[in-house]
Swiss-Prot record:
Presence of keyword S-adenosyl-L-methionine: no
Disulfide-linked positions: none
Gene Ontology molecular function: any one: DNA binding
Organism name: Xenopus tropicalis (Western clawed frog)
Stated name of the protein: POU domain, class 3, transcription factor 4
Compartments, as annotated in UniProt: Nucleus
Polar residues compositional bias, start-end: 118-130
GO BP terms, alphabetized: brain development
Renumbered residue ranges of the record's region Disordered: 98-130, 143-191, 332-360
GO cellular component, one term: nucleus
Keywords assigned by UniProt, alphabetized: Activator, Developmental protein, DNA-binding, Homeobox, Nucleus, Transcription, Transcription regulation
One Pfam family linked to the record: Pou
Bias kind Basic and acidic residues: ranges: 164-182
Length: 360
């Protein structure tokens, strides 16, 4: 019988594990586990002279009773057993850590503890085999702490495959910032658009062009005809930011063309080519307005001959007199509510008043 100093399980047998000291005395197969081969183990078992020990080894090698539970024979697999200090800490402090961990093909770790096929069982001095899985210190619950018979993967592998560490660095933000910085150089701000719209309206009125003239001029110069409503909405800042940015350079070029052509001998022709020039508003003197008002009270809708004779007497264009009578009739309709006296009665009363005023 070997001494207690040569038994690596002597400390555990007296403290945490409930094993017979006589059972765990055989320690020679575990002294150098990395040097012990399967052939040496098979040669050493029959020399003890116990028939059950030899029968146990041969039956495992032939019938393979472990195939139904663990997938392969313990003699064909490479088992992993911790050393002395690991067993002591696992039994006394960490009660949940397994004393025996099967080494399966899924968890092949070359840098694990020293492995040997002889670690699956221990022999007593009489040569009787002891199955360590049947002892109280090696319960099934200890083997199933990590779920099933499959041992947990090494900690290094788990940490290296952590989802957070596997996530690639997102460079989308960097690309978007780069594109944003590039676009900011060309895209004007809302304040710049507001200031340009104000200046454009002032310069357009100063040059004598309507909003429709600008739309036609853009179609003549650049091939994009814009309506009067579009130019109006641009000046009122009622277009979308994207459309404002698209329309701003076109209007800016049109202003540059209009300013450069001003003062030259052919400035009128160039401006007329850009679009329909705005007609100047006709200003009528107060005395002339009185004469027209008198004729309107007499005849709200004069004939073409009367308009021509009146235009000649007032030294006005025939079109100006015609437009004035047309606007005056529209004004009368807006001012006269329904149900009032007939217009000819009002006109006759007004004629007398106006005649007296004119004579004065």
């Amino acid at each position: 019988m070997a001494t207690a100093a040569s038994n690596p399980y002597s400390i555990l047998s007296s403290s945490s594990l409930v094993h017979d000291s006589a059972i765990m005395q055989q320690g020679s197969p575990f002294r150098n586990p990395q040097k012990l081969l399967q052939s040496d183990y098979l040669q050493g078992v029959p020399s003890n002279g116990h028939p059950l020990g030899h029968h146990w080894v041969t039956s495992l090698s032939d019938a393979n009773p472990w195939s139904t539970s663990l997938g392969s024979s313990p003699l064909d697999q490479q088992d992993i057993k911790p050393g002395r200090e690991d067993l002591q800490l696992g039994a006394i402090i960490h009660h949940r850590s397994p004393h025996v961990t099967h080494h399966s093909p899924h968890t092949n770790h070359p840098n694990a503890w020293g492995a040997s096929p002889a670690h699956n069982s221990s022999l007593t001095s009489n040569g009787q085999p002891i199955n360590v899985y049947s002892q109280s210190g090696f319960t099934v619950s200890g083997m199933l702490d990590h779920g099933g018979l499959t041992p947990p993967p090494p900690s290094g592998t788990t940490q290296s495959l952590h989802p957070v560490l596997r996530e690639p660095v997102d460079h989308g933000d960097l690309g978007s910032h780069h594109c944003q910085d590039h676009s900011d150089e060309e895209t004007p701000t809302s304040d710049e658009l507001e200031q340009f719209a104000k200046q454009f309206k002032q310069r357009r009125i100063k040059l004598g062009f309507t909003q429709a003239d600008v739309g036609l001029a853009l179609g003549t110069l650049y091939g994009n005809v814009f309506s009067q409503a579009t130019i109006c909405r641009f000046e009122a800042l009622q277009l979308s930011f994207k459309n404002m940015c698209k329309l701003k350079p076109l209007l800016n070029k049109w202003l540059e063309e209009a300013d450069s052509s001003t003062g030259s001998p052919t400035s009128i022709d160039k401006i007329a080519a850009q679009g329909r020039k705005r007609k100047k508003r006709t200003s009528i003197e107060v005395s002339v307005k009185g004469v027209l008002e008198t004729h309107f009270l007499k005849c709200p809708k004069p004939a073409a001959q009367e308009i021509s004779s009146l235009a000649d007497s007032l030294q006005l264009e025939k079109e100006v007199v015609r437009v004035w009578f047309c606007n005056r009739r529209q004004k009368e309709k807006r001012m006269t509510p329904p149900g009032d006296p007939q217009q000819h009665e009002v006109y006759s009363h007004s004629v007398k008043t106006d005649t007296s005023c004119n004579e004065l």
